[in-house]
Amino acid sequence: LNWELNSPEDFEKLQKDFAAVVLCVGGRKAKGLPGIQVDNKQIYHAKDFLTEVTKDMLNGTELANLKDKDVVIIGGGDTGVDCAAIALAQGARTVHQLEMQECDATANSARDNLCNIVIGDYTISYGTMMKRLLRDEEGKLKAVEVAQVEWRSERSGALPDAMEVLGSEKLLRAQVLILALGFSGPEDEIFEACGVKRSPAGMLADGGE
C-alpha cells in the first residue's frame, strides 16, 4: 500500500521479494483535445479536478472554488455530470456540459427515460462540439466557441460522421474548462518500469515478459 512503481529497479525488487507479480492496471491516462494544454488552473482533466475537490473536502481546506465563474465541461458522461454537480454546488454562475453524440446514441439513453428528462435542461447540450478557445489580452480563458453537429453517413453502409451545422456557431463564456473525455489506457510509466510490451494502440500486448 502507498507505494508507486516508478522504475525498472522497483519492479526488479518486487520480482525478488515475491514468487509472482500480477500487473493489474486501469486506464488512468486521461484523453485530451488537440491544441489544448491542461494547466489545472483554468483547464482541467476531470479526474484531476475531482481529485482536488475530494482532497480539499477530506482535509478541510479551501475548495477549488468555482463561485461566480462560467464553467464549460466537455463530455456528457457520468464523470462530466459529477463535475457539473460540483460546479453548481460551489456557486458557478453558469455551467454548460457539451456532448457530441445525440442523447439517444449515448450509453445512458435507455436509463430512466433520460432523453425525455433532459429536454429543456440548459446545462447540457447534446450534438454539440467545441471549435476553439478564446482568450483575453492576458492570455486568460474567456470563452469557448461551439457549434451543433449532425450525425450522417456520406455513403450507404458507412458509419455516421459528425458534420458541423453551418451557421450554428455560438460563444459560451468560460473561465474554467473541464475535459471529461474518458481514458486512453494505462499511464506510460507502468510499462516503462515493468518492460511490458504494448500494442500499437497503447494497450497490453501478448508476449510481454
Report each predicted region and the residues it spans:
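Feature captures the FAD/FMN-dependent oxidoreductase FAD-binding
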Residues: 1-36, 132-145, 150-153, 176-178, ...
